[in-house]
């Protein structure tokens, strides 16, 4: 396919993997615990950080709490399955649950200050790393806290075949639009309703 190298290069623009060992925490962003948390466990085992911190998303359906559907319960189950005894903490939300990467950045900044962290690695899906890192760097500017990013891959698509799946197309087309919005904002857009 003549277009495959171009589409792969486009996808690679969105991926950042600049995490270094010695971080205070691996911060797993919400919205993809099934891929992001196992990646954080790998990084924990490789000595990147001594703890894993989960962000606190706003639940779409509060009734699911009793079923163990929140991300902390899922992370606990994944940790048990892996056999890795990584400490898991939850970063409390400043406003009743994060609805965006900007919300998570503000929440994590407050958490880092309270715990005197100097270096964190955010763990998210590979296609989300550039925008997530950009949002965190904007919010963390002047804090003297170093922020890095590492991406998690999934079993459905990669940067080399994303255009062959609905989920890959959705991820990479939407990510471009989201990146453009994040360039101009430092918080959730007032015209976008996040629930």
Which residues make up each language-model segment?
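A structural signal for short, hydrophobic/glycine-enriched beta-strand patches
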Residues: 4-164
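A transmembrane-helix-recognition feature enriched in membrane-embedded lipid enzymes
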Residues: 165-192
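Short linear elements at protein peripheries
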Residues: 23-24, 189-195
